[in-house]
């Protein structure tokens, strides 16, 4: 049983599965990393300022999944699609303006970049690029935006990295806002992971005499008419309600997150003298339609500011339970079908899509399920090939807003067949791997016999390990480069 419970604005949790997962990873700052990626900051707030990217779309639930074609800069994602790697669930990451994304402070010189891997496949290399000194931060990211000579290259040696690792890189000198592009080239697929990192170099922040930042207004969600949002101001003794500023959401315009953020910052500046909100410029604080820092007067005795909400209509709890998904399916003569039972808590719309390892959609289903009801769903795959597959489940509320999504993994396996007589082959793959040469015949996992190709392709026949299977006969992504199928 797979259950997706909602708490507050829904945090999905699923029962663990024994099946494998696809290679995934992202640039993080959980330990010693200097800056997290744009996608990671959609899900995880910064540890020092609690800032987080907003309106990211589905990638906020899967920051590890910004995967696209490899070969950058010669090939790879198209200009304008570099930040998303042309992945649909990351499309929002391609938005590019000077004030769209949270920026992390950085200095030129030696810096630590940290990667977190949810599946640590063999690696060809990591490369780091940075935007040119004269780049345009209000134009879509393109190859012309970047210095295409990587400032840091780390050899992966075609081995599996640990689940978390760091790279020491010498960051070039820059001023102000720049974007770093970190590319992880996976060694056993034709894909790479693209992580853009928004950074701000020292020397660009204004010195604000007698003021220190104590919090910020982050437009995390839209509100409804009748709700309110307010500041919670703390001094050494605890919360001091005398400095509280509250904004009532009294019309449809204010329901939009960027609008109430601007309005609350403006109201703080009108009502308070020891607090001010907005961007500092020319000796004044100017509210913006986005994230607004909140500053405290240095001698005020105030320590920090948090944001609170009065929600007139409680956010409903949603959950979706998925029963019937097996970890493995045997491929037979009929198309493979997944027989599932979906059970909902709360009125919701469920969207299910099955993908193979190469992210080709093979089956889909969409339907509304009422609170407490169950729905029987059969997903018949358009093709059945051995290997890793994914069931992606999306939950939407009654307004059509994406609540959350989750990926469940399963495998298809070839039907057991009677192997041919042993005299017709030299080895059962991968036995005797080091002795494979041109003409060597092996019995593969699909029950068929494969023969190692002549030179110069015969060298691929011995390139195999449990974590690097691209040349494995029958199932490897590039097996036809190494082998000829004989029966």
Curated annotation (Swiss-Prot):
Residues 438-479 form the Chitin-binding type-3 domain. Its main location: secreted. GO terms for molecular function: chitin binding. It is found in: Secreted. Gene3D superfamilies: 2.60.40.2550, 3.30.70.2150, chitin-binding protein cbp21. CDD domains: LPMO_AA10. Keywords: Chitin-binding, Secreted, Signal. Residues 61-80 are annotated as: Disordered. Residues 24-201 form the Chitin-binding type-4 domain. Residues 1-23 form the signal peptide. One of its GO terms (cellular component) is extracellular region. PANTHER family: CHITIN-BINDING TYPE-4 DOMAIN-CONTAINING PROTEIN (PTHR34823:SF1), GLCNAC-BINDING PROTEIN A (PTHR34823). NCBIfam families: PRK13211.1. Belongs to the GbpA family. HAMAP family: GbpA. Probably interacts with GlcNAc residues. May promote attachment to both epithelial cell surfaces and chitin. This is GlcNAc-binding protein A. It comes from Vibrio parahaemolyticus serotype O3:K6 (strain RIMD 2210633).
